């Protein structure tokens, strides 16, 4: 969608973010309720956290057949997961598949970061201002930015004097990073650190991990999904959906 907007256009609903939640909201608001809906996405493509977090080893720690949309039987039957715990690239491919299958891309404006939201109490309308000073108006606004949309960069003394390369798992470059024959330090052993450490260690000359608080970690026991499992899952979609809904309560 073009970034140039006609400011006279008022949308029924504007969704901020094109990750899992944003895509689902666009589908429900546009296709099920019939609202004129627009998604504003800061990135260049859909994916949300799976667009930004593309560090080595990035992977979901929920099983693939539970980490997906259940509102569309067509998507459930046409998409095949390859692993028990899918990696970042596969999840991103899945979200692009969902976007194209449901025809959502036409209602998403990329490279558009919302910087301010104001409510006009006289006109009962939301006014959204973006980083390029464009304005959008909507009766409803849905924030679907999630809890992982902003990278937390620690303030460490001397960082500005460091002459080497600095990377953050939440702001990983799209192009591959070569760690061959390099000394690497990783700060933190949360989920991102645990996933990245063994992958980076394969190529780095030396790897040092800085850990503040020891944690308990067990092997993921990841595995490829067999054709038998996929077939069984697709034949019992209603059962799995019922079980997952019950597990929420």
Roles of regions detected by a PLM:
Residues 29-35, 75-76, 103-108, 123-124:
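Short, charged helix-to-loop "capping" segments that act as catalytic/coupling loops
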Residues 20, 50-52, 81, 115-128, ...:
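Tryptophan-centric aromatic hotspots in well-structured domains and transmembrane helices
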């Amino acid at each position: 969608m073009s970034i140039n907007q006609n400011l006279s256009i008022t949308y029924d609903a504007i969704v901020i973010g094109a990750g899992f939640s944003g895509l689902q909201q666009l589908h429900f608001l546009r296709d099920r309720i019939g609202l004129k809906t627009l998604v504003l996405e800061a990135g260049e493509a859909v994916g949300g956290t799976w667009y930004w977090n593309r560090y080595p080893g990035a992977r979901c720690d929920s099983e693939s057949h539970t980490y997906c949309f259940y509102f569309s039987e067509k998507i459930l039957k046409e998409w095949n997961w390859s692993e028990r715990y899918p990696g970042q690239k596969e999840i991103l491919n899945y979200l692009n598949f969902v976007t194209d299958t449901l025809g959502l891309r036409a209602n998403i404006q990329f490279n558009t970061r919302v910087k301010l939201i104001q409510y006009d109490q006289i006109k009962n309308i939301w006014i959204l201002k973006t980083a390029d000073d464009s304005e959008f108006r909507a009766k409803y606004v849905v924030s679907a930015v999630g809890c992982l949309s902003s990278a937390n960069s620690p303030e460490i003394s001397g960082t500005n004097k460091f002459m080497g390369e600095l990377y953050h798992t939440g702001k990983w470059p799209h192009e591959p990073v070569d760690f061959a024959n390099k000394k690497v330090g990783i700060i933190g052993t949360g989920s991102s650190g645990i996933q990245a450490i063994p992958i980076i260690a394969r190529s780095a000359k030396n790897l040092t991990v800085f850990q503040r608080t020891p944690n308990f970690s067990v092997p993921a026991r990841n595995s490829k999904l067999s054709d038998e499992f996929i077939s069984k899952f697709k034949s019992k979609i209603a059962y799995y959906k019922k079980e997952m809904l019950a597990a929420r309560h």
